[in-house]
Structures are given as structure tokens and as C-alpha cells.
């Protein structure tokens, strides 16, 4: 352990791993892997609470989570590089179980006295895992051999003292390692779908080795959140931004359950909404929520702010900033308002900052967590910021929200502005609304609305020549986007039936006179994002 402390540069900290609190958790240290959030999802699916934190997070920042074990994620670095990120020494001193994945395994090796070197035989993609031992808790119930997903260019040349190889692949003699102190390493990614039995390993680690209990439920989360909201708000006043989506609906319902009439909901029509969206949203909220709701017509204000702007990142910044200004204006009218409630989710937080880890790059700003001006006078309250989308839906069901709201497809905070390539104008908004209405109508008619994660139209800035009747046309190109996903962190393009795509295309070019060409986006995430901007 002295080796680990010296290599991490950390001082020894006194840790009592046996302290009992109301919650137990798995803490995941992020080293910059694109799959880090998937690890968290897999643990949450087991009804065990977990959090993803930066690899250099000090003990005092996670002690309240009552960790029962640690997972070290993968990452793009090599542990033998001078500035390579390493795990804090306290995870080894805690006597708690540790599981390193890919780079995390190499960090364990390096910090505990082993040797990691560059490999001439890199492994990227599928491999077959073969066990070296008959009985091991970590690999219990794993098929022999088992397909796994590899993504590494370094290898373990020498195991740390006390460790042994538990499994191997054709090009990797140490694909799984472990010692008698329940410190393990995997040279593959058990969290991805390409490792079909990877969940077995994670379950073995969480339940059999860390001895966690599957007791983290949305019912428990509601009670805990209500207590936290009451403590945070006190006798203050809260305004909540309603969008009509499940996120803001759940936030409003949860906060209202906690503080009642201390909450005022504000619905802003920014002119970037879909057809009939404002009317439908107000109808649902007034009939099912029983809350104080203020409707704000800010169409002119938003469209003027967006005039001449074509850069997608700038659009998001402007819209986010304008939203806050609107809420500040409304807060002044209402009197003393202390908090702004938002439906920020865990993936929003991860994508918008330079990751939880300092080792990966920012993808793009999110409306809920980006574009906020430095002078913002309202304090934020974000009770969903550690939840995934599917967890928010479960929470909404637990709170008694109508299915129409719970299962509504995600709609971005910046609205149609980021589905119009180039400058946003009133004319383009009407064109896109008409095309999008057709897409949604036909998707619902085909009973595929709940089979896809999102489906929508994009108005591109491309125009092309066409022929309608005896006349030449020069119209816009509209793209159709439909994806399947679990959490929006990764997504695959939806294999919609050709007949359905044909119907949608024919309706758009015949009913939206400004459009004469329709294409279907067959890109997955990654490398593309779900939204075009």
C-alpha cells in the first residue's frame, strides 16, 4: 500500500469502512472512458446506488456515500506516461473491494508494484475469454468461453505481488486478475452490450464480493429527495421551468410534493416549440398537477435574440441565457423568489462538463447546464441531476403522473432551434413544424412511437432542384431522424419500415410546399450525436 500511496501522490487518510449510514453505494472513479456512464447504469439497474466521480476525488467528498466497493473506469491514457491519472491511495487502504476496468486494471497494476507496457498485439473488438481457475467469485456463472469486448493497446507485463491471472484471451494472457484482498482487474469492458455476459461479472462484484443490497428504489429516492428539498429550500420560494417534457414534469411534481405552494411553475413559450405543444402542455398540467402556473409569451424576445446566429453552440448559449433572464423577470414580478428548479439529468451533467474526469473532453453544452450567465441571481435546485432518463420515468410513475407525460419522447431544451441548420427564422420554424407534425403523426399511427427513443424532422440549410408537375422547384431538404437508445449516451438509428418512410416522405413533399427532398439519417451515436446541433 505504501507503493500505491507514493505513486498516487496522496497522503494517508484514516478511513472507517465499517461505518453504517442510511445508504450504501458503489463509487466509480472516472478516468475518461466513453463507457464510464454505462458502468453507472449497469449498477443502478441492480437497484444499487452508485455515483461517478473524478479519479482524483478526495475521501471526504465521497465518505457520505458509505461506499461498499470501488470501480475504476477505463480511459484513453497509458499508466506509464508521466502525467497519467492514478487512483487515490485510500481506495487500497480502505480494505474495500476494488474492480479496475481496462485502464483501471492497469492503474491498479502500476500503483501496486506491477509493470504495464505498450503491447505490439493490440486488442480492439471481440475476443473470447477463457478461465484459468475453476472457482472464483468474480467469474462465477460465466460461460466458458465467453465473448467480451476489448479496447486496449497496453498489456500487463508483470502482475503485482499477490495477484494471479484468473482468465485470458488469445492475445491477452492477463485478461482478468485478482488477489485475496478482493482487488480485481478486467482488461475488457463488461458494461457494454458487446460483452453479453458482462453483467454477470458486475453482479458478482456488487452482490457477492461487495455484499451490497438491492434496496435503492424510486420510492426511497422520493422520500430522500423530499427531505433534501425541504432542507435546501427552508421557507424560500421556488420557480420551476416547465417544458412539457417528463423531466420538468417530474421535477415539478417532486418539489410540489415536498413544499406545496412554495412552488410556482412557469411555462415559457419561446417560439421554438412544436405544433400545438403549448396548448397540450398547459392542458395536461392544469388537469393533473394542481399547481400554480404562469404562462409567459416570450416568442418575440427569443427570436430577436437568435437573429443572425448560425453557430449551434452559440444558439444553445443564447437560449439558455434568455431563459434565465425570463425567469429573473418573472421572479421580480412575483416578489421574493430564491430558487430555480431544473430537470437536469445525469447524462446532461456528464456531457456538458469536461467529463466528471479531467481526462476526457466536453461534447457540447446542454440547455439546462450550459449558457447560464455568471450574474444569475437565483440558486439552482436540481433533484434529478443524478438520475438517468429511465429512472426519471420510473420516478414519474411512482409520483402518479399520467402515462402521456411519462412516456413522451425527449425534446431538447433549445427546442426546434437546434433542428434548424443555420439561422432560425419564423418561416423556417413553420416549415419544420409542419414536417415534424407529419413525422410524429405517422410514427404514432404505425404504433412505433414507444419503440424508438426519439423521432423527429430536421430542416437543413441545403436546397435542391426538383420537379413537381411541369414546374421546376428549388426547395429545402428535410432529414428524418429516429433512434433507439436506453439513455441517450449511445444510440442506434431505428430500422423503420420502408413503407413507413415512404409515407412520411410523400406526405412531407406534398404537404409542405417549401420542401422537395427528404432523406433518412442512418448514423449511430457515437460517432454522431442524436440531435444534429
UniProtKB/Swiss-Prot annotation:
Top EC class of this enzyme: ligase
Xref: SUPFAM superfamilies: Adenine nucleotide alpha hydrolases-like, Class I glutamine amidotransferase-like, GMP synthetase C-terminal dimerisation domain
Domain GMPS ATP-PPase: 216-408
Catalytic reaction(s) noted: XMP + L-glutamine + ATP + H2O = GMP + L-glutamate + AMP + diphosphate + 2 H(+)
One Pfam family it belongs to: NAD_synthase
InterPro entries: Class_I_gatase-like, GATASE, GMP_synth_C, GMP_synth_GATase, GMP_synthase, GMPS_ATP_PPase_dom, NAD/GMP_synthase, Rossmann-like_a/b/a_fold
Entry keyword DNA-binding: no
Pathway noted in the entry: Purine metabolism; GMP biosynthesis; GMP from XMP (L-Gln route): step 1/1
Positions in coiled-coil regions: none
Name this polypeptide is given: GMP synthase [glutamine-hydrolyzing]
Gene (name only): guaA
Amino acid at each position: 500500500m505504501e507503493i500505491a500511496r507514493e505513486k498516487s501522490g496522496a497522503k494517508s487518510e484514516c478511513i472507517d469502512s465499517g461505518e453504517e449510514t442510511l445508504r450504501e453505494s458503489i463509487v466509480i472513479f472516472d478516468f475518461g472512458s466513453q463507457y464510464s456512464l454505462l458502468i453507472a447504469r449497469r449498477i443502478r439497474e441492480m437497484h444499487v446506488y452508485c455515483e461517478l466521480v473524478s479519479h482524483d476525488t478526495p475521501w471526504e467528498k465521497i465518505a457520505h456515500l458509505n461506499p461498499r466497493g470501488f470501480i475504476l473506469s477505463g480511459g484513453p491514457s497509458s499508466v506509464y506516461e508521466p502525467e497519467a491519472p492514478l487512483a487515490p491511495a485510500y481506495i487500497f487502504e480502505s480494505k474495500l473491494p476494488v474492480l479496475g476496468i481496462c485502464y483501471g486494471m492497469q492503474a491498479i497494476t502500476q500503483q501496486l508494484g506491477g509493470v504495464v507496457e505498450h503491447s505490439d498485439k493490440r486488442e480492439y473488438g471481440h475476443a473470447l475469454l477463457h478461465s484459468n481457475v475453476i472457482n472464483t467469485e468474480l467469474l462465477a456463472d460465466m460461460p466458458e468461453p465467453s465473448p467480451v469486448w476489448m479496447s486496449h493497446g497496453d498489456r500487463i507485463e508483470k502482475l503485482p505481488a499477490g495477484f494471479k491471472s484468473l482468465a485470458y484471451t488469445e492475445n491477452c494472457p492477463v485478461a482478468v486478475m485478482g488477489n485475496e484482498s478482493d482487488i480485481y482487474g478486467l482488461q475488457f469492458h463488461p458494461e457494454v452490450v458487446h460483452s453479453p455476459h458482462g453483467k454477470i461479472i458486475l453482479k458478482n462484484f456488487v452482490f457477492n464480493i461487495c455484499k451490497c443490497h438491492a434496496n435503492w428504489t424510486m420510492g426511497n429516492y422520493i422520500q430522500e429527495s423530499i427531505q433534501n428539498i425541504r432542507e435546501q429550500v427552508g421557507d424560500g420560494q421556488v420557480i420551476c421551468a416547465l417544458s412539457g417534457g417528463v423531466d420538468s414534469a417530474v421535477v415539478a411534481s417532486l418539489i410540489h410534493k415536498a413544499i406545496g405552494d412554495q412552488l410556482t411553475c412557469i411555462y415559457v413559450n419561446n417560439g421554438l416549440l412544436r405544433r400545438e405543444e403549448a396548448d397540450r402542455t398547459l392542458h395536461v398540467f392544469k388537469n393533473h398537477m394542481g399547481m400554480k402556473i404562469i404562462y409567459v409569451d416570450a416568442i418575440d424576445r427569443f427570436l430577436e435574440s437568435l437573429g443572425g446566429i448560425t453557430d449551434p453552440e452559440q444558439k444553445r448559449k443564447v437560449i439558455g441565457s434568455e431563459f434565465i433572464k425570463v425567469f429573473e423577470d418573472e421572479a421580480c414580478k412575483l416578489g421574493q423568489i430564491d430558487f430555480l428548479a431544473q430537470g437536469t439529468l445525469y447524462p446532461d451533467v456528464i456531457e456538458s462538463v469536461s467529463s466528471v474526469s479531467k481526462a476526457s473532453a466536453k461534447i457540447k453544452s446542454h440547455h439546462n447546464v450550459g449558457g447560464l450567465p455568471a450574474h444569475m441571481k437565483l440558486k439552482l435546485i436540481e433533484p434529478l441531476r443524478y438520475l438517468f432518463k429511465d429512472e426519471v420515468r420510473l420516478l414519474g410513475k411512482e409520483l402518479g403522473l399520467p402515462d402521456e407525460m411519462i412516456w413522451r419522447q425527449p425534446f431538447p431544451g433549445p427546442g426546434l432551434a437546434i433542428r434548424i441548420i443555420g439561422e432560425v427564422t419564423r418561416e423556417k420554424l413553420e416549415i419544420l413544424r409542419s414536417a415534424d407534425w407529419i413525422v410524429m403523426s405517422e410514427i404514432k399511427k404505425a404504433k412505433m412511437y414507444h419503440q424508438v427513443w426519439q423521432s423527429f424532422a430536421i430542416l437543413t440549410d441545403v436546397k435542391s432542384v426538383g420537379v413537381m408537375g411541369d414546374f421546376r422547384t428549388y426547395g429545402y431538404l428535410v432529414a428524418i431522424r429516429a433512434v433507439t437508445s436506453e439513455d441517450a449516451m449511445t444510440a442506434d438509428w431505428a430500422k423503420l419500415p420502408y413503407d413507413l418512410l415512404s409515407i412520411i416522405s410523400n406526405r412531407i413533399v406534398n404537404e409542405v410546399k417549401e420542401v422537395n427532398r427528404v432523406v433518412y439519417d442512418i448514423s449511430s451515436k457515437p460517432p454522431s450525436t442524436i440531435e444534429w446541433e
